[in-house]
């Protein structure tokens, strides 16, 4: 199923925290994306129902295999877009 741009942002951040720290927490995501805790919690419920993350209410947010694959793709896509924009500016 296709993720909304908003859920993609959440998943990409979770993936970045995951590769850095090994986990993410709702507070981390809230600060990083500058969104309220209830908004993050709502998004986490959605991502969990779509089988991208494992989520314990007061615990850490983990990634499923599907979440890791998608997160990796989103980060890579972002890098490609950034390089493309740099190329456009150079011309």
Model-derived features with residue positions:
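Amphipathic alpha-helical dimerization/coiled-coil segments
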Residues: 79-91
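Short, hydrophobic-biased segments on the C-terminal half of alpha helices
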Residues: 44-45
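N-terminal helix-turn-helix DNA-binding core of bacterial DNA-binding proteins
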Residues: 3-35
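Key DNA-contact positions within bacterial/archaeal DNA-binding proteins
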Residues: 38
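Alpha-helical residues within the helix-turn-helix
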Residues: 31, 48-49
């Amino acid at each position: 199923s296709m993720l909304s741009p908003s859920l993609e942002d959440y998943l990409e951040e979770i993936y970045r925290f995951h590769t850095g720290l090994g986990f993410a927490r709702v507070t981390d995501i809230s600060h990083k994306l500058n969104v309220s805790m209830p908004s993050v919690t709502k998004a986490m419920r959605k991502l969990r129902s779509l089988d991208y993350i494992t989520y314990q209410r007061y615990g850490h947010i983990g990634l499923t295999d599907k979440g890791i694959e998608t997160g990796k793709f989103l980060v890579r896509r972002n890098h490609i877009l950034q390089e493309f924009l740099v190329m456009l500016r150079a011309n």
